[in-house]
Design a protein with these regions (language model features):
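Hydrophobic alpha-helical bundle cores within soluble ligand-binding/oligomerization subdomains
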Residues: 1-238
Length: 238
């Protein structure tokens, strides 16, 4: 994989650009950078944003499926279920069944990827509000960027904009995992069978759910919160 690497001296490098040099760019720009090896110009970014904006909404049947899950279902299980429920929307699957030539496989895969990526913030935020009883879902705002929309749809206050900046950086840090870890390897393996992105992304999420992979983030947060509680709040700068 040549889309990203980790250097002992420079840290995370995405398509030849050190992370610290591109912390100001939008997730949509990172997506374009990963695919093409360069940052988009203004017209290309606008076109990509318009493409994303066309596919922000989650089909209602997905919410119905999720609403029937147990109240104590893990958000990752719900997230995975939501994506898999949308597999019938796959452009690749439909075109493959119609006899699409191999030379056009990449086009259908890319279309699936864009449509799925566009929906993930609404799915994740909607599951958060559903799972933790935060009220009705909040509709996406097509004027906001990918990370900004996620923050908006969680309903969490962000008057300072710090949460938006944090999510923007967090998404960038996790945008590409070289290919050697469990989730990336699982996704690549499933995709190699010409399973569409809905299937392959779900395979990666199943690996990500393990305590030696993505679930470690949750365990780490639990530890940090326990330390905070033990010392009665956040530490001072001293």
């Amino acid at each position: 994989c040549d889309t990203s690497s980790v250097s002992a001296e420079k840290g995370l490098i995405i398509r030849g650009k050190p992370l610290l040099d591109i912390t100001h760019i939008l997730p949509e720009e990172v997506f374009f950078l990963l695919l093409t090896g360069r940052l988009p110009n203004e017209a290309e970014l606008s076109e990509l944003n318009n493409e994303f904006s066309s596919y922000l909404n989650i089909p209602e049947y997905v919410w119905k499926v999720l609403s029937e899950m147990p109240n104590d279902a893990h958000p990752m299980t719900m997230f995975n279920t939501g994506i898999l429920a949308m597999q019938g929307e796959s452009i690749f699957r439909k075109r493959y069944d119609e006899g699409m030539p191999k030379t056009e496989f990449w086009e259908a895969i890319l279309e699936d990827g864009i449509r799925l990526l566009a929906k993930l913030p609404a799915l994740g935020a909607g599951i958060y509000r559903m799972r933790f009883d935060k009220g009705d879902r909040i509709e996406p705002d097509p004027q906001k960027d990918w990370s900004g929309n996620f923050v908006h749809m969680t309903g969490l206050p962000d008057d300072s904009g710090d949460f938006h900046k944090l999510m923007q950086l967090y998404f960038m840090l996790h945008c590409d995992h070289e290919g050697g870890n469990v989730s990336a390897f699982a996704s690549h393996t499933v995709a190699s069978a010409l399973s569409d992105p809905y299937y392959s992304v779900c395979a990666g999420l199943n690996g990500l759910a393990g305590p030696l992979h993505g679930l470690a983030n949750q365990e780490c947060l639990k530890f940090v919160l326990s330390v905070r509680d033990k010392f009665n709040g956040l530490p001072t700068e001293k």
